[in-house]
Amino acid sequence: MERQKISEKFSELREKKEGALICYVMAGDPSAEKTGEIVKALVNGGADIIELGFPFSDPVADGPTIQVAGQRSLAAGMDTQRYFELIKNLDVGIPLVCMTYYNPVFRYGVEKFVEKAADAGISGLIVPDIPVEEAADLKNSCEKHGLDLIFLIAPTTTEGRVQKILERGSGFLYLVSRLGVTGAREDVSSSTRELLSRVETGLPKAVGFGISTGEQAAEVRDAGADAVIVGSAFVKIIDEGKDVNERLEALAKELKSGIKRAS
């Protein structure tokens, strides 16, 4: 299907002087059919970009909420072929980003995985466990098929590595707002502000890991972020299984209005 490029989405939002809301959910949790409804609810709530997690049995960067979501997805039969079919069937008109660990990409074949991702309508790829120094093959395949390769930068990332990421990354930069794994937390840390001011780039800066309220989203936007990434707070609602779509849409609306208020 026709896919919107991430850069197009950010240009569109920049014209409106608006920040982006990037929503993460695990593909196939609790089922492929339900994922379609979940994505629609998030889009209705104001999501600008959707990140769809690819489940993996050893998710080193994920907090407990997302780990359990991955287990549910795998138990429901999610695999590479079904993942791409699911993506192909999503007709949402906004960029879709695949978040996956490197092992499934490597096992499937880097070139083949990226080609299938592009064919399915994916605009970008996030692979949190591949160092930028080892990502040449992946980067080449992404460039060949028109996908953005998005890297993570943490407060502990060295200056040398930050420079390599700025040279090789595209789409947006994923800034990790605190140390440790993903999960909803209470306040926006000073390390987030320091990281935003430290990284100088023309690429949009998206802050993730730990944001769960409109207030936090507004704070992150005020601190200089171009986008806010929210995952665990949505996955928790899916996990609870009660009034899921209504609550997802309501939370997305709250987050988006926080981002708009700060803009």
UniProtKB/Swiss-Prot annotation:
Presence of keyword Amino-acid biosynthesis: yes
Keyword Nucleotidyltransferase: no
Keywords for this protein: Amino-acid biosynthesis, Aromatic amino acid biosynthesis, Lyase, Tryptophan biosynthesis
Catalytic residue list: E51 (proton acceptor), D62 (proton acceptor)
InterPro entries in the record: Aldolase_TIM, RibuloseP-bd_barrel, Trp_synthase_alpha_AS, Trp_synthase_suA
Entry GO terms, CC: cytosol
GO molecular function annotation: tryptophan synthase activity
Record-linked Pfam families: Trp_syntA (PF00290)
Catalytic activity: (1S,2R)-1-C-(indol-3-yl)glycerol 3-phosphate + L-serine = D-glyceraldehyde 3-phosphate + L-tryptophan + H2O
Pathways per UniProt: Amino-acid biosynthesis; L-tryptophan biosynthesis; L-tryptophan from chorismate: step 5/5
EC number(s) on file: 4.2.1.20
Subunit note: Tetramer of two alpha and two beta chains.
Family that this chain belongs to: Belongs to the TrpA family.
HAMAP family registered for this protein in UniProt: Trp_synth_alpha (MF_00131)
Function, in words: The alpha subunit is responsible for the aldol cleavage of indoleglycerol phosphate to indole and glyceraldehyde 3-phosphate.
Protein name in UniProt: Tryptophan synthase alpha chain
Organism: Methanosarcina barkeri (strain Fusaro / DSM 804)
Gene name of this polypeptide: trpA
